[in-house]
Amino acid sequence: MSAGEPGAWGVDRLVLLAPIEPATTGNGLAMRAELFRCAAAVELDVETVVVPVAGRLVAADSSVTIVAVDAERARSGALALAADPAWSDRLALASPLPLPARLASPGLVDEVACAVDSSGTVAVHVVRAYMAPLGIALGERLGARWTTLDLDDDDAAFASAFGDLDAARAYERLLGVFGPEFHGLCAASADEAVSIGRRHRLAVDSLPNAVRVRGLPASRPVRAVSRETSLLFVSNLTYQPNVEAAEQLVGTILPALRDRLAGRVSVTLVGPHAGRLEHLRADDVEVTGFVPSLESFYASATVVVAPIRHGAGTRIKLLEAFAYGVPVVASSAAANGLEVVDGRHLLLADNCDEAVAAIEAILAEEGLAPRLIDEAGRLVRARYSFEVVAPAVRDFFARADARARSGQRATID
């Protein structure tokens, strides 16, 4: 590449705009942002800017630029944007925006743009739908060659399932207005990508979550028979569906197992919880908060249990358990979107009785745990490893560049 010539995908640098710092562990959204950051960094420099509407990590990366959420500056900036007829129309059609989109308001574009190196040719990748208005504003302000959006989940469908119809309609409006402005969109689930694409006539790629498997053993030694059963739940424990799952695990599943098993049964809850799980602490219940490394927790776990009843965000944690070689018992909601087969890669359980029976089966049935571990490990290496998914992310960016070159967006005629 000669001096002054753009690099990969027609740009010198990628600006990644996210609602949380990218990280290798601790939070599913942070891990997904890290996937895109690392995939792009193979080809060019990546500058990460975070407007932390999805929270802050304890062990934050000092190279990440944080732009604080400021309601007053956001309001004044939005008024300035509204003076532009195109933005006035966009905001009128999309309003009221979902709450996270109001916090990460497009009115913050001046502050975000000032935090970014504006030299050379740039592209902008945006993480989550609620960051889309700010992402489009930033792309226009920087003169970005192309912009992409990782939806991750179907926010409208999730809000509707949760009974929040106002939020569901807000996300539909947002994506209807801002989705067609992007050169590429993607989601973690193939089914959700298809559903979103059909509803909004958008070309939405499926890019699954991924975990690092390099350096991990191809299989975990079979644990010696023990009179202690250690149940592990790893997640963002500030997220309400995960809080409810932790409460069900400790309050319902744990007592039922104690009544049926002879040895000690314990639960370890790992992940940031902002004090919301203090009431669950007990002699046989450990609440760790954020930890920088999960290796020791997976090494000592008998079974990973994810009794999510609704919501999203646990799927990447199931992949992590697969990669570490721990048998998994999970609800259908927790495994939604993963190409898993009940009884082959994990055991599905959608209520307390099913969860208890599944855990008992893993403990009692000879060969079941090693078989689940082996099949899940094969799956994660073939479908959900960084080594497999990162090239697909780079192909996604290449398609966005190709659309930009031909004057197209990610829309379906």
Regions found by a protein language model. Name each.
Residues 32-33, 211-299:
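Conserved catalytic-core segment of nucleotide-activated headgroup transferases in glycan assembly
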Residues 368-383, 389-395:
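A short, well-ordered alpha-helix in the C-terminal region of glycosyltransferases
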Residues 346-353, 361-367:
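Conserved acidic donor-binding segment of nucleotide-sugar-dependent glycosyltransferases
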Residues 191, 209-210:
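Carbohydrate-associated surface elements
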Residues 296-313, 324-327:
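Acidic donor-binding loop of glycosyltransferase active sites
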Residues 317-320, 327-331:
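Short hydrophobic beta-strand element within catalytic cores of glycosyltransferases
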